[in-house]
């Protein structure tokens, strides 16, 4: 004879759902997510992730645009803002964000990130980095900028690799 077991309803209760939500892991209410934006095209792909995190946790987004001479970083920041506004309109949710201009350019913005996040009055709870690009010889010898941020940051760092054809040296 076959033995059949009764299946139990294993759907989470309301208390379990609240305990497992993203905000109870690392983002407290009123915290911020630091999103650096450089001239690389891959930066735009962070828009989906930072928008999702802001919607689910109620965190404030700080878009830190690199102070470049060209218009690529500015264009990437504008594309991220457009994505945030589109999602906010579609869902009817409020997503708060602000745009700041960094002191450094796209090649030196990483050195500024840990200074911003580690200040005593900083509400930043997470830094969102893109770690997918073509690495040069200096990255192989001295380490990539993402590794510098991870080693010196006082807040969690989330690395995003949007391209399957490239890899991250920080994995």
Predicted regions and their residues:
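Active-site phosphate/pyrophosphate- and oxyanion-stabilizing loops and adjacent acidic/basic residues
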Residues: 51, 111-115, 147
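A short, acidic, amphipathic alpha-helical segment used as a generic capping/interface helix at domain edges
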Residues: 84-85, 105-120
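Small/aliphatic-rich secondary-structure junction motif
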Residues: 9, 14-17, 24, 28-99, ...
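Short loop/edge segments at beta-strand edges and connector loops
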Residues: 99-103, 161
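Gly/Ser-rich helix-loop-strand patches that form or flank binding pockets
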Residues: 1-26, 117-171
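Amphipathic coiled-coil/heptad-repeat helices and related helical stalk/stem segments
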Residues: 18, 46, 109-110, 142
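Short, small-residue-enriched loops and turns at beta-alpha junctions
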Residues: 69-73, 104-106, 135-136
């Amino acid at each position: 004879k076959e033995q059949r077991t009764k299946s139990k309803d294993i759907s989470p209760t309301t208390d379990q759902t609240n305990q497992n939500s993203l905000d109870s892991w690392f983002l407290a209410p009123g915290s911020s997510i630091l999103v650096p934006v450089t001239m690389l095209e891959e930066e735009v792909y962070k828009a989906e992730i930072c928008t999702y995190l802001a919607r689910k946790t109620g965190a404030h987004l700080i878009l830190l645009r690199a102070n470049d001479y060209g218009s690529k970083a500015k264009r990437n920041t504008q594309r991220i803002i457009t994505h945030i506004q589109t999602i906010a309109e579609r869902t009817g949710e409020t997503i708060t964000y602000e745009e700041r201009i960094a002191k450094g350019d796209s090649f030196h913005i990483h050195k500024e990130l840990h200074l911003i996040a580690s200040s005593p009055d900083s509400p930043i709870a997470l830094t969102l980095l893109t770690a997918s690009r073509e690495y040069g010889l200096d990255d192989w010898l001295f380490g990539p900028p993402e590794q510098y941020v991870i080693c010196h940051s006082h807040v969690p760092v989330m690395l995003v690799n949007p391209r399957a054809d490239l890899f991250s040296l920080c994995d």
